[in-house]
Amino acid sequence: MAAGQGGWLRPALGLRLLLATAFQAVSALGAEFSSEACRELGFSSNLLCSSCDLLGQFNLLPLDPVCRGCCQEEAQFETKKLYAGAILEVCGUKLGRFPQVQAFVRSDKPKLFRGLQIKYVRGSDPVLKLLDDNGNIAEELSILKWNTDSVEEFLSEKLERI
């Protein structure tokens, strides 16, 4: 039985070594990743850098460079920067599962914010993408568990009201 387990673990160990090598190569570049790249690597769009500090507790230190490239400092959430626009993405067929987001989207409240677009994307959970002056995604946040007031308050801080 031990031989069978060893044979099963070898591919997993090889994959871990490959991932560790890739992560080390990325860390040597000191790269920051786009929100899409981070999502593909399995990191949340609202990952805080303080979470990366916990990787050592789980023997996941090889992931640290990528985690640092995908995380946001806590101080970034406290800035009063106004964004040029925002896109609230949600799947129309899933909207009923998120009644608070549904209430916001179907109300007149989105019309109060300059540059806010509601975009229906098949299969998407509710996500808020904040856009810079060039129309590029500057921040991306999951609003899965936000209530209507939280969405409105956050947008009031980040977008210009009409």
Swiss-Prot record:
It holds the Pfam family Sep15_SelM. It comes from the Eukaryota. One of its GO terms (biological process) is sperm DNA condensation. One of its GO terms (molecular function) is thioredoxin peroxidase activity. It is found in: Endoplasmic reticulum lumen. Keywords: Endoplasmic reticulum, Selenocysteine, Signal. Its main location: endoplasmic reticulum. GO terms for cellular component: endoplasmic reticulum lumen. Highest levels in prostate, lower levels in brain, lung, thyroid gland, and large intestine. Coiled coil: none annotated. Residues 1-28 form the signal peptide. Belongs to the selenoprotein M/F family. May be involved in redox reactions associated with the formation of disulfide bonds. May contribute to the quality control of protein folding in the endoplasmic reticulum. May regulate protein folding by enhancing the catalytic activity of UGGT1/UGCGL1 and UGGT2/UGCGL2. Forms a tight complex with UGGT1/UGCGL1. Interacts with UGGT2/UGCGL2. Interacts with RDH11. PANTHER family: SELENOPROTEIN F. This is Selenoprotein F.
